[in-house]
Amino acid sequence: MRFGILIAFSGLMAINGNALAEGSLNVYNWSDYIAEDTIANFEAETGIKVTYDMYDSNEVLEAKMLAGSSGYDLVVPTADFLARGREAGAYQDMDLSRIPNASNQDSEIQAQADRMVGSNSAGLVYMWGSTGIAYNEDMVAERLGDDAPTDSWSLILDPANAAKLEDCGIAILDAPTDVLPNVMTYLGYPGTSMDKSHFEAAGDALSAIRPYLRYINSSQSINDIANGDICAAIMWSGDAFQAAYRAEEAENGHVIDYYIPNEGTNLWFDVMAIPADAKNVDNAYKFVDYMMRADVAAENVNYVWYASGNKAAMPDIDPEILSHQGIYPTEKAKEKLFVTPVYDAQTDRIVTRVWNRFSAGN
């Protein structure tokens, strides 16, 4: 699920829905969610010309998929959105026999995603991760002291803390299906709840801190927290670690940390899937098989700092990534992780209404 600087790949262009079916491939993925040379290497190996476009929310992707004729051959929705899209006929089944490297997949991770989607032929998990809080150690300590609750959602969701952090900048993901369930866990409700009153309570809690937020955006926080322009953010795990790495590389004095709150958080899976009306299906399979190669999967993990669905890639993944509990949680930490359910139409309307009211500041 995941963001940052837009990378200019060879072949980046507008999609017009009339791409030639031979020798081309149109991919739509989250921004900053692939190693810098992966596309160029695939093109060099296969001769297939790739058009690689990026989005910053599942809602944007879903709108294109449900409208039809998107022109894309491969997309990477989060599992719950893939489930909804499949119900609407927006995606086709994936024939795993056409993907030899599918055998590299972590069967446990894939099984969790398959249960969420409701099918074992919807697609293959690309990356998985959590939602938590990233923060600037020094800037937060200056305002909240050494006993700042850097293990809890209260760091941001408690209005008293948010007020003290307002001057250094707080940001929240523009991702209602990730944020609202976690606010519910902070309030003591199950993150898997679909009770209207629980969503309303979560919306009220967010509205209480709305005056102290710098912005609600999913693609801006990586650079801003790395540069010290904000000091705390609700972020996806890999984005937070990319920010920490960028700050370290820049030697700018900002130390960024990330944690999974002790109240619990959601576990999500991003899945490579083929739209129902894809024109370049053969090339989509070739690309998925390439992405499932152990060496390619490891290179992508080492760049984006998200956990991989590829078990065979583990030996080539940076040990720092493998050992970080914010990326690969311990078994104890996993006990507090939950998978957001696929919302029905009524619940989805509640989520949209609550989120719009909060984001508008009403």
Q: Language-model segments: which ranges?
A:
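Paired acidic/hydrophobic, glycine-rich loop segments that form the ligand-binding mouth/hinge
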Residues: 73-76, 214, 231-236
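Periplasmic-binding protein-like
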Residues: 199-208, 214, 252-273
